[in-house]
Amino acid sequence: MDPCECSKTGNCTCGGSCTCKNCSCTSCKKSCCSCCPSGCSKCASGCVCKGKTCDTSCCQ
């Protein structure tokens, strides 16, 4: 099983090498979510994404 596979309904906690393109997890690390900008220090440690957008607690 691909450790970087992102399911649509579950959680994923991929490591720094994760290159998921279409992560739809409800809880996901920054490395799995393209919605989190690489230059954000708060996102660097991981943020919660909803589909392709970050929640209100990310990068505020």
UniProtKB/Swiss-Prot annotation:
InterPro entries: Metalthion_dom_sf, Metalthion_dom_sf_vert, Metalthion_vert, Metalthion_vert_metal_BS. A divalent metal cation 2 binds at residues 6, 12, 14, 25. A divalent metal cation 1 binds at residues 4, 6, 20, 23. Residues 29-60 are annotated as: Alpha. A divalent metal cation 6 binds at residues 36, 40, 43, 59. Residues 1-28 are annotated as: Beta. Keywords: Metal-binding, Metal-thiolate cluster. A divalent metal cation 7 binds at residues 49, 54, 58-59. It holds the Pfam family Metallothio. Class I metallothioneins contain 2 metal-binding domains: four divalent ions are chelated within cluster A of the alpha domain and are coordinated via cysteinyl thiolate bridges to 11 cysteine ligands. Cluster B, the corresponding region within the beta domain, can ligate three divalent ions to 9 cysteines. Metallothioneins have a high content of cysteine residues that bind various heavy metals. This is Metallothionein. It comes from Gobiomorphus cotidianus (New Zealand common bully). The gene is mt.
